[in-house]
């Protein structure tokens, strides 16, 4: 990993953005084009068979993907060079964890890892502060528990819904769900419509399971934390 990060640093120092093309600084040579399916299959097979030098080739040939995704976040106030650096870390993770037996293209898997890495970076470095307390009690539910603003507003657990959008993310999520017990699985299925019957609110799930909304909220936060931990193990 240290070798790859050193390689990344050298590559990024040589990259400049110009119009719609990417060039190495100090020359007129454009970055290499994306891999064709046959090229990718050949390189991945060599990597699987122990040729570690292939990693750097896969990274360099997918740098255009990093730049493309990084540019989508230009309006966040973070410099595009920083976004490219962070995104390339996601690409490195993708190359290191890519499983060709899943029948998913490296570019597809890599794009989600790149985007997730950038999103996590933006969340960690966000300077936006809420001007109201997320822990201000709003009400008392029927079993005497305080219902907090943080219980009903969307937080990082909304990323679970976003994780369902792509095929790669579906597989990651379904694998992580296997780590939950039956009640936890049921709550996630109901809240995020994984059974095809539509999403349920916390109150609806609470009524269906015969427990309070505040308890559902606490369970959901614990479940989301565990799912994110399991998914991060695979990235």
UniProtKB/Swiss-Prot annotation:
Keyword Membrane carried by entry: no
Source species, domain of life: Bacteria
Secretion signal span: none
One Gene Ontology MF term: sigma factor activity
Annotated source species: Clostridium acetobutylicum (strain ATCC 824 / DSM 792 / JCM 1419 / IAM 19013 / LMG 5710 / NBRC 13948 / NRRL B-527 / VKM B-1787 / 2291 / W)
DNA-binding region: 202-221
InterPro entries in alphabetical order: Cro/C1-type_HTH, RNA_pol_sigma-70_dom, RNA_pol_sigma-E, RNA_pol_sigma70, RNA_pol_sigma70_r2, RNA_pol_sigma70_r4, RNA_pol_sigma_r2, RNA_pol_sigma_r3/r4-like
Gene label: sigE
Motif interval(s): Polymerase core binding: 82-95
Known function: Sigma factors are initiation factors that promote the attachment of RNA polymerase to specific initiation sites and are then released. This sigma factor is responsible for the expression of sporulation specific genes.
Keywords: DNA-binding, Sigma factor, Sporulation, Transcription, Transcription regulation
Name under which the protein is recorded: RNA polymerase sigma-E factor
PANTHER family reported for this sequence: RNA POLYMERASE SIGMA FACTOR RPOH, SIGMA FACTOR RPOH HEAT SHOCK RELATED
GO biological process: DNA-templated transcription initiation; sporulation resulting in formation of a cellular spore
Family under the similarity heading: Belongs to the sigma-70 factor family.
